[in-house]
């Protein structure tokens, strides 16, 4: 694979496992065979998740440059910032996290939302958590630049890790490795996955998978489900990162488009719709697999809808990419009242 030439610092247990979600498949009429690639349990660092795979290719740069602080940014319940806090602890670096107000949470619930879930874990791991009132944007942020400047002015050497690692030059490399794993695991399992379904917001996960699968001429197997609700921006950023990553790994393919299903991101980033809640419950009740209301709940909602619509050919093997995110669930407790037995 073209990613082999890049330095990598191991943060995961190795290739993430693939589970057969056979009860979910049966529940949906046995039309297709659903499998999940479990990025949600890929590491012993603070519950793991997809960002660690990206960070593995960024750490060599951090270690080499002798940086003092890791600085990252996300919403209040960002998984990215939790992972950067864990990484900082692992590397013995200080950590500053900018947690912006990306999600319109009702005032009555804001206090809980700002204290539990991912943000709580980051605080436990010793990060300097800065809660800022700016709204959602997948691009580069003023608050982020300010934090970096402040640390530099104080004589420190901060390392910037942008939202979702996406604007980092190596942000897409981790999921090239993911694509290589899928190809190897197909051989081990004796099956071929017809389609790969993945959540998309800041773009580098999907971009890495696209570039990685393009090594095997299978980039069209990827179906991304938008959870940003700013899908044009997400598509543009994903294509840019995919093309940049393809160049890095020596793949002669120019991405001009990819499948991005935009039907499930409403009402906005970070707020589940009724279908999202239903999908989270369905997956949990059928499989004991937990998905979150921000990312995976929406991609699971998309997967279930596509199966019900007969989007996939009968008997298809569909690989759902579980990117993590469950630590945010406690911040959304009001969406999940007790069901009577």
Curated annotation (Swiss-Prot):
SUPFAM superfamilies: Tryptophan synthase beta subunit-like PLP-dependent enzymes. It is an enzyme of class 3 (hydrolase). The modification N-acetylserine is found at residue 1. Pfam families: PALP. Coiled coil: none annotated. It catalyses: 1-aminocyclopropane-1-carboxylate + H2O = 2-oxobutanoate + NH4(+). Gene3D superfamilies: 3.40.50.1100. Keywords: Acetylation, Hydrolase, Pyridoxal phosphate. GO terms for biological process: amine catabolic process. Its EC number is 3.5.99.7. One of its GO terms (molecular function) is pyridoxal phosphate binding. Its cofactor is pyridoxal 5'-phosphate. The modification N6-(pyridoxal phosphate)lysine is found at residue 51. CDD domains: ACCD. The active site is at residue 78. Homodimer. Catalyzes a cyclopropane ring-opening reaction, the irreversible conversion of 1-aminocyclopropane-1-carboxylate (ACC) to ammonia and alpha-ketobutyrate. Belongs to the ACC deaminase/D-cysteine desulfhydrase family. This is 1-aminocyclopropane-1-carboxylate deaminase. It comes from Cyberlindnera saturnus (Yeast). The lineage of its organism: Eukaryota, Fungi, Dikarya, Ascomycota, Saccharomycotina.
């Amino acid at each position: 694979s073209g990613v082999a030439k890049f330095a990598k610092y191991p943060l995961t247990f190795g290739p993430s496992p693939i589970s057969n979600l056979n009860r979910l498949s049966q529940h949906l009429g046995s039309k297709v065979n659903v499998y999940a690639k479990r990025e949600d349990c890929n590491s012993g660092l603070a519950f793991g998740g997809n960002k660690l795979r990206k960070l593995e290719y960024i750490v060599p740069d951090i270690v080499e440059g002798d940086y003092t602080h890791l600085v990252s940014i996300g919403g209040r319940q960002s998984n990215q910032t939790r992972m950067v806090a864990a990484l900082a602890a692992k590397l013995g670096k200080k950590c500053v996290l900018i947690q912006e107000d990306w999600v319109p949470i009702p005032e009555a619930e804001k206090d809980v939302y700002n204290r539990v879930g991912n943000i709580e874990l980051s605080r436990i791991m010793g990060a300097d958590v800065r809660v800022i009132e700016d709204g959602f944007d997948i691009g580069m942020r003023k608050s982020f630049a300010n934090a970096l400047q402040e640390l530099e002015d104080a004589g420190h050497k901060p390392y910037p890790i942008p939202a979702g690692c996406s604007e980092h030059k190596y942000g897409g490399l981790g999921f090239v490795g993911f694509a290589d794993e899928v190809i190897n695991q197909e051989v081990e399992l004796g099956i071929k996955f017809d389609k790969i379904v993945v959540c998309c917001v800041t773009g580098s996960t999907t971009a890495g998978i696209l570039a990685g699968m393009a090594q095997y001429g299978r980039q069209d197997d990827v179906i991304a489900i938008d959870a940003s609700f700013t899908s044009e921006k997400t598509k543009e950023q994903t294509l840019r990162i995919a093309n940049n990553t393809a160049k890095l790994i020596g793949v002669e393919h120019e991405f001009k488009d990819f499948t991005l299903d935009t039907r499930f991101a409403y009402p906005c980033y970070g707020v589940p719709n009724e279908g999202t809640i239903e999908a989270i419950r369905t997956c949990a009740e059928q499989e004991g697999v937990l998905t979150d209301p921000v990312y995976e709940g929406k991609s699971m909602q998309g997967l279930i809808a596509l199966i019900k619509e007969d989007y996939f050919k009968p008997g298809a093997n569909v690989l759902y990419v579980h990117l993590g995110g469950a630590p945010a669930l406690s911040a959304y407790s009001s969406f999940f009242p007790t069901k009577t037995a």
